[in-house]
């Protein structure tokens, strides 16, 4: 089976490297980083990969607006959001745009990996349904 491909959209190079190291040790492939929402949108449109790991707080357009743009351009996009803002209002805002998973920063490695596994399985199930 092909590796699940991921881009990390986070303005923190340190966080991006931590995520890359963790997920690649566990069978995923990080094929790019973006430091802003604008870069992340462009990268996704060029590569159409499996999962976008997206921070909320970034310069320029934030993660919520980035997710809205990605969802409008590709309703099948799979997004995992990370943020130090995990209050009820933020969670409701994230869900309203169709993102199902928001993990608090700093994240627990096992939670991040378990969530990626759920997203991967969900994406595989959708592909099977589309092929039937």
Give short role names for the model-derived ranges.
Residues 13-32:
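Two-component/phosphorelay signaling modules centered on CheY-like receiver
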Residues 47-53:
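Active-site beta3 strand of CheY-like receiver
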Residues 117-132:
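The C-terminal output helix
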Residues 36-39, 62-65:
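Acidic catalytic/metal-coordinating carboxylates
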Residues 65, 86-103:
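Alpha4 helix (beta4-alpha4-beta5 surface) of REC/receiver domains from two-component response regulators
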Residues 89, 107-117:
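C-terminal output helix
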Residues 58:
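Receiver (REC) domain active-site loop signature in two-component systems and cognate sites
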């Amino acid at each position: 089976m092909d590796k699940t491909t991921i881009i990390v959209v986070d303005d923190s190079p340190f966080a991006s490297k931590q995520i890359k190291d963790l997920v690649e040790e566990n069978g995923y492939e990080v094929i790019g980083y973006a430091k802003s929402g604008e870069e992340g949108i462009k990268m996704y449109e060029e590569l159409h990969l499996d999962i976008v790991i997206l921070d909320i707080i970034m310069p320029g357009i934030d993660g919520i607006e980035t997710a809205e743009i990605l969802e409008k351009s590709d309703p099948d996009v799979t997004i995992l959001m990370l943020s130090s803002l995990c209050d009820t209002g933020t969670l409701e805002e994230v869900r309203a745009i169709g993102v199902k998973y928001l993990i608090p920063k700093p994240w627990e490695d096992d939670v991040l990996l378990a969530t990626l596994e759920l997203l991967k399985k969900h994406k595989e199930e959708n592909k099977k349904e589309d092929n039937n």
